[in-house]
Amino acid sequence: MPLRLINFRQQRRCRQSPSVARLESIVLNRRELLLDHFQYSLFQNSSEIPMTTILINDRPMRHTHDGRADMTNFEMDLFDTRIEVPTSKNSGGDGMHSPYYDEESSKKRCCKCGNSRNRIIKPACVPISIVSLFIIALVFLPLFNEEDLASPIKLTTGCSVDCKTFLVESIPIGLPFKTNNHTAEAWINIIDNSKQYLDISVMYWNLNTSDYKSSVYGRRVYEAIIRAGKRGVKIRIAQDGASNLSDNKESAYLVQEGLAEVREINVTRLIGSGIIHTKFILSDIATLYIGSANMDWKSLSEVKEVGVVFQECPCVASDLYKIFAAYWKLGENDSVIPEKWPISYRTPFNFSSMAKLTMDGEPAEYFISSSPGPFNPKGREHDLAAIQKIMKDARKSVCISVMDYIPSTLYMKKSNRFWPEIDDSIRDAAYRGVNVRMLISHWDHSRKEMIPFLKSLQTITDGLPRYNRTEHGQVQVRIFTVPPNGKEKIPFTRVNHAKYMVTEDIAYIGTSNWSGDYFISTAGVAMVVRQPSATKRLQNVFDRDWNSEYSKDL
């Protein structure tokens, strides 16, 4: 007995227009005809049976090589029939229409199906609609969470301009080193050229004093900030709120005179310990400074500092602005760290995906790293991870200049612990054949335990594997000491306060000392650039200091 297609839809069909009923009749008849042919071909030897041709719409249905019917024409005819079916001209139609685009027919099929036993489609519409709305909300609602990042100027991620950069330094009075770009002059230039906005992240304030002759640079910078506020530049300052290193009278005066808005970030309240150790200036979301210098006159004339300036570079400035915006948000009263930072705070730029730009006429790549982890939205490279990856990427040379180097935490009281993350990366680099040179500061406040840790790094050289019989990695350590400035003794001065690293490919300039606390619970940032010219400039500074009379073997 021939197989017959059971039309379940016909048993539960809603009331339909004649055109739709006719469509179902056509489809049913054609399916029955096709199945009869399938059954005949299935149970008979196709090689012994004469070829039979089935006509559909007066066209022959072809067969495949094994005698089965070719479905192509049938499916296309069925599709064509479903798209256009005859209609009654008495009802105002032109003789052909598509029930799938007939709004009235759709309503009848989906919403008015007669008595309850015929309601097939309507109940399904409800859960499908709910699921669809849920998916839409899940995917698109986060995209509307942009109001949390208030930006006075449209941020950009595309670097279409040639960014000008300057390596800037503070050279303590009495050191014979020369620099083309002094930190104080760079700051004053940035501030004086600000037209609308000036955002500053600072640990503490100590610019405006006349107690010492060398404090003139500090006063000049502070006067530049006052001038900017008076000419209408909107100044915002995000400063540490828990360290008690200064009474911050200078920022308080700016607020009192209506020249600036200040917010304090209490890192200890937010994550249990830590401070804002970041130092950067951002002008008009276009020009910026990142470096080791504090807003302290000593950092401009009595302490050795290193930083970098990006001039008229909106893409880099926009990325730094997101970090400032996070600080600004955390400076609100009763603020909490978001469980998940809004999308608008995210960055696409990190070690795995550096931003491409033109820097001083040459191709370059960059990203900005930050710590601690809870302050970082998605995409932002943690400062520690940046250091580790840069060392892992090095093939020939790693040169490090930092004030403090201790593989432990220092400020967690009874909870201090061994912290070997950077120490292990240094050893790993040397083991792979990289020449590691470390220039560490020595001054009145250096910790005694630092020297044994440095010696332990240096002594591994003799145990490192040799490559090509003669070549092998090594760790060399030198101590850099800034001599006193005559008879004048100024507290917390005469030290190399720089925090940078340079390899054969990458220049890293940061704001953090190299001990555990600065990456676990202290806020800091770093600029990372991959460009031959940038690395050469920073390498020249390192080599100058390394080979100077102020550098001694450990």
From Swiss-Prot:
Glycosylation positions in this chain: N181, N208, N244, N266, N333, N350, N468, N513
EC number per UniProt: 3.1.4.4
GO biological process per UniProt: lipid catabolic process
Catalysed reactions, as listed in the record: a 1,2-diacyl-sn-glycero-3-phosphocholine + H2O = a 1,2-diacyl-sn-glycero-3-phosphate + choline + H(+)
Cytoplasmic side, ranges: 1-123
Domain PLD phosphodiesterase: from-to ranges: 272-299, 492-518
One GO location term (cellular component): membrane
Keyword field: Glycoprotein, Hydrolase, Lipid degradation, Lipid metabolism, Membrane, Repeat, Signal-anchor, Transmembrane, Transmembrane helix
UniProt topology in membrane: Single-pass type II membrane protein
Extracellular topological segments: 145-554
Family per record: Belongs to the phospholipase D family.
Protein name stated in the entry: Probable phospholipase D F09G2.8
Organism: Caenorhabditis elegans
